C-alpha cells in the first residue's frame, strides 16, 4: 500500500497545524525507513517478560522475548508503532530473523533459561530465517527454545506449520500458540498440530472474576488444551483476582 502523500495534504490544507502533530505524522509515514535503518545499524534488542506457573510459590517457566527497535536518538520504538507497517512485508521477515538471532544468542549466553520467540507461518519458507535457525540450534539450545506462532498465522498455512513442527520437535524445539481462542482455529486441526503450549487470548482473561462468559470460555479452552496435553497459559493477567480465578479453573 503506498504511503500517504503528506505534500498533497499540505497543498489541500488538511495537514496538521500543530508542529508536534506534524512530526508524529511524518514519523509514522517514515516508519518502514526507520525499521530498515534500525536493522541495518544493529539497533534491535529483545525485551523480556517472564511467564510464571500458577502454583505456589510461582516459578518462572520461561521468558518471552519481544523485538524492540531504537531510533537514531536511542529511544525505543514500541512494537505497536512499527509492526503494523511492516509485518506483511519483507521487513517483517527481517524482523523475525533479528528476533530469532537475538533469542538464540541469549540462550547460548544463559544456559539456565528457556525463551519463547515470535515467528509467523511465512517465516518457515524464508531462507534467511531458516539459516539463522539451523545455524543456532547448537546442542543444549534447541531444548530451551520455544517458537511462538499466533493462532491466525498457524491457520494460514496449517499443513506447512505441521510439517515444520514435526521437523523441529525431534531437535528439542517446543511450540506455543499465541491468541488461543481468538476465533480462527478449527479445533479439528489441534490433533494435527503439535503445540506444547497454548496462550489463552487476553480477551477471555480480563476481568474474568466478574465475567461469567469469560469464565465459561476460559474453562473450555483450558479443558481443550489439557485434553491435547498442552500447557495452558493465560495472557495479560494483571490482577490477583484474575490470577486466583484462573488458578481455580486449572490454568498451568
Task: Pin down the residues of each PLM region.
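Catalytic core of bacterial c-di-GMP phosphodiesterases, primarily the EAL and HD-GYP domains
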Residues: 59-64, 91-160, 236
Amino acid at each position: 500500500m503506498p504511503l500517504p502523500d503528506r505534500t498533497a495534504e499540505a497543498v489541500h490544507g488538511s495537514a496538521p497545524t500543530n508542529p508536534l502533530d506534524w512530526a508524529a505524522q511524518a514519523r509514522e509515514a517514515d516508519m518502514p525507513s526507520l525499521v530498515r535503518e534500525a536493522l541495518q545499524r544493529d539497533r534491535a534488542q529483545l525485551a523480556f517478560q517472564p511467564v510464571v506457573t500458577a502454583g505456589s510459590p510461582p516459578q518462572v517457566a520461561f521468558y518471552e522475548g519481544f523485538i524492540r527497535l531504537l531510533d537514531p536518538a536511542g529511544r525505543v520504538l514500541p512494537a505497536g508503532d512499527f509492526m503494523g507497517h511492516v509485518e506483511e512485508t519483507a521487513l517483517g521477515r527481517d524482523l523475525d530473523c533479528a528476533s530469532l538471532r537475538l533469542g538464540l544468542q541469549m540462550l547460548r549466553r544463559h544456559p539456565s533459561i528457556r525463551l519463547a520467540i515470535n515467528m509467523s507461518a511465512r517465516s518457515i519458507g524464508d531462507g534467511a530465517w531458516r539459516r539463522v535457525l539451523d545455524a543456532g540450534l547448537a546442542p543444549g539450545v534447541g531444548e530451551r527454545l520455544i517458537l511462538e506462532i499466533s493462532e491466525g498465522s498457524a491457520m494460514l498455512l496449517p499443513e506447512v506449520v505441521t510439517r515444520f513442527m514435526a521437523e523441529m520437535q525431534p531437535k528439542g524445539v517446543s511450540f506455543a500458540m499465541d491468541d488461543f481462542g481468538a476465533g480462527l482455529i478449527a479445533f479439528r486441526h489441534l490433533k494435527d498440530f503439535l503445540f506444547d503450549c497454548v496462550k489463552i487470548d487476553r480477551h477471555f482473561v480480563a476481568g474474568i472474576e466478574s465475567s461469567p462468559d469469560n469464565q465459561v470460555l476460559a474453562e473450555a479452552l483450558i479443558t481443550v488444551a489439557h485434553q491435547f496435553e498442552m500447557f495452558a497459559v493465560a495472557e495479560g493477567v494483571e490482577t490477583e483476582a484474575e490470577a486466583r480465578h484462573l488458578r481455580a479453573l486449572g490454568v498451568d
